[in-house]
């Protein structure tokens, strides 16, 4: 039987989870480099295709087939009318599907060798003679092809998806009329009937696909977190800075990837670097976080004045020989005990410059610079400044992904001290080395790591969970590879 084709706007079902991730990747040749990039591999698209096919199958089974009526004229019998009605889809099999990339355009979602089984009723009338019965319709070798165009909303920074075209093809349609004295009469017109039902199914399928894209897939795209609030100080801008770009093997999109202040949005005084992704395809999703992304976090929190803490003696284990008291400090700085006898000491630690993180193939290196100011706590609870020192160090940062959040742990190397000011007279700053080497690991670092373990959310849409995560540091960016599951 001659192949038929229907075209119409395209629509897709609720396989949106991967498709939203599809719309967040990395095109590193833009005029403005992204701070965060996500790349979807063919493996990721294959998973999206599986999810999409399962969802589409449910949607297509809900197709309502309109009644079909026509007239007939047979020599010696004259004219009559017949109708096919109450048609229901009993089975809609979609055995093979694929999402492929169309370079510089978007995606193509295709299904081949679909089979449909439909049951319904028929009736015929010739003057006062009425006949009726049941029928079964079998559609074999149906193919569906939908072109999906990906874009971005320049105002909201969210991804968009539209269906630029949809087509369906049916290889064969067969109608079987139930036993009836006049069933043979309907069989005389089976080609006409099959052609009419073929056209109706083609148009209904593309209409259903189109409605799914606009009513389900596009709204799901809006669940992608763009402006994500972290706390009262900062949030993350995950908005797209360019429309998604496709090649023959990958789908890439650029995201701003920048921490911002909840109080004021000033652009950082540095720019994102270029990220050159390696050729990797064994994970569904690849996420690149540039050092720009991390360093905007340090800038925002330092400018907000929240990178600080106060250390007191009651925070030190009782069994420790190191104490934050003027008596203990007097053992190596006699002037402290002389001027402020038998008093507690408070130490205020604050970032003097925004902390800087460097990402290299060898790992993540952290460069904090802090001011450490010591005060004697007077009997009236007021504070008397003792000295101010600068403290520099380098550290290594270990990161991982837990529950779709990026978490970290900081380890510090040797502390380098510099005396900036003293109210107790000049002294060798090396005298403070032991006490700093003690209080930083047991008081400062645990509190920093407690914050880092809370982490911050990665740009994943609703109901998508990352697993099987691998991390690799590269020049200027950290690369995550992960598989995903839609829950």
Curated annotation (Swiss-Prot):
Record field: transmembrane: none
Residues carrying covalently attached carbohydrate according to the record: 380
PROSITE patterns the record matches: LBP_BPI_CETP
Location of region: C-terminal barrel: 291-461
Disulfide partners: 166-206
GO cellular component: azurophil granule lumen; extracellular exosome; extracellular region; extracellular space; membrane; specific granule lumen
Entry comment describing in which tissues the protein is expressed: Restricted to cells of the myeloid series.
InterPro entries: Bactericidal_perm-incr_a/b_dom, BPI/LBP, BPI/LBP/Plunc, Lipid-bd_serum_glycop_C, Lipid-bd_serum_glycop_CS, Lipid-bd_serum_glycop_N
Region called Cleavage sites for elastase, residue ranges: 240-245
UniProt region (Central sheet, part 3), positions on chain: 468-487
Region described as Central sheet, part 2: 226-290
One Pfam family per UniProt: LBP_BPI_CETP
Localization, UniProt: Secreted; Cytoplasmic granule membrane
Domain of life, source organism: Eukaryota
Signal sequence annotation: 1-31
UniProt comment concerning the protein's domains: The N-terminal region may be exposed to the interior of the granule, whereas the C-terminal portion may be embedded in the membrane. During phagocytosis and degranulation, proteases may be released and activated and cleave BPI at the junction of the N- and C-terminal portions of the molecule, providing controlled release of the N-terminal antibacterial fragment when bacteria are ingested. The N- and C-terminal barrels adopt an identical fold despite having only 13% of conserved residues.
Subunit details: Monomer. Homodimer; disulfide-linked.
Name the UniProt record assigns to this protein: Bactericidal permeability-increasing protein
Naturally occurring in which organism (per UniProt): Homo sapiens (Human)
């Amino acid at each position: 039987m001659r192949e038929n084709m229907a075209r119409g706007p395209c629509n897709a079902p609720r396989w949106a989870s991967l498709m939203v991730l599809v719309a967040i990747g990395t095109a590193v040749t833009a005029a403005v480099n992204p701070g965060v990039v996500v790349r979807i591999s063919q493996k990721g698209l294959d998973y999206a295709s599986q999810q999409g096919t399962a969802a589409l199958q449910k949607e297509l089974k809900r197709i309502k087939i309109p009644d079909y009526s026509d007239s007939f004229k047979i020599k010696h019998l004259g004219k009559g009318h017949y109708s096919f009605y109450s048609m229901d889809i009993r089975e809609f099999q979609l055995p093979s599907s694929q999402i492929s990339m169309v370079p510089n355009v978007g995606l193509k979602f295709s299904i081949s060798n679909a089979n449909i089984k439909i049951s319904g009723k028929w009736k015929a009338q010739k003057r006062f003679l009425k006949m009726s019965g049941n029928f079964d319709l079998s559609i074999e070798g149906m193919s569906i092809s939908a072109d999906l165009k990906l874009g971005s909303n320049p105002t909201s920074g969210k991804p968009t998806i539209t269906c630029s075209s949809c087509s369906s093809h049916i290889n064969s349609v067969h109608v079987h009329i139930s036993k009836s004295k006049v069933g043979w009469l309907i069989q005389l017109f089976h080609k006409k009937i099959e052609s009419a039902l073929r056209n109706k199914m083609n148009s209904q399928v593309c209409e259903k696909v189109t409605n799914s894209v606009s009513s389900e897939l596009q709204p799901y795209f809006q669940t992608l977190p763009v402006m994500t609030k972290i706390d009262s100080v900062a949030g993350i801008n995950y908005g797209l800075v360019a429309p998604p770009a496709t090649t023959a093997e990958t789908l890439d999109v650029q995201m701003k990837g920048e921490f911002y202040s909840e109080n004021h949005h000033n652009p950082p005084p540095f720019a994102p670097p270029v990220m050159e992704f390696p050729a990797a395809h064994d994970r569904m999703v690849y996420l690149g976080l540039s050092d720009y992304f991390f360093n905007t976090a340090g800038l925002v929190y330092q400018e907000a004045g929240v990178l600080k803490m106060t250390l007191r003696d009651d925070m030190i284990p009782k069994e420790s020989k190191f104490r934050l008291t003027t008596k203990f400090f007097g053992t190596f700085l006699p002037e402290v005990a002389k001027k402020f006898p038998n008093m507690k000491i408070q130490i205020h630690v604050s970032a003097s410059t925004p902390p800087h993180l460097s990402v290299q193939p060898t790992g993540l290196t952290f460069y904090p610079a802090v001011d450490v100011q010591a005060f004697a706590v007077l009997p009236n609870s007021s504070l008397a400044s003792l000295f101010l020192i600068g403290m520099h160090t380098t550290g290594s940062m270990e990161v991982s992904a837990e529950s779709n959040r990026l978490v970290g742990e900081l380890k510090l190397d040797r502390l380098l001290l510099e005396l900036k000011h003293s109210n107790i007279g000049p002294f060798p700053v090396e005298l403070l080395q032991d006490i700093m080497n003690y209080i930083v690991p047991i008081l400062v670092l645990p509190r920093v790591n407690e914050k880092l373990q809370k982490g911050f959310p990665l740009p994943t849409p609703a109901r998508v969970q990352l697993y099987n995560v691998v991390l690799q540091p590269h020049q200027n960016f950290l690369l995550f590879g992960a598989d995903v599951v839609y829950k």
